């Protein structure tokens, strides 16, 4: 993935405690999902709400480390996958499965595979 002809790179950071996390809004989660989301939020350095799709672009840039969302539709996330993965990041559902048209609506995007793995561990602990 490139921006103005330059390859996008992600941050080398692999620690959730120092990364910025983003989500559209806290009301996008069911009660059970919010408990899992809140555990991940507590492990991250900072949280921002309201960036919507812009947050995924920031994941590709490496400015945001993790985006965790729910209640998503395929048109919300499918076009973002190649951008993030092309920049070296990873995007799956909360179970770590590839996103498809039949996915459950949960999305976990991370700037690095290490951040993604750490976030998955917390979401599924």
Provide a role label for each language-model segment.
Residues 9-125:
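An extended, acidic
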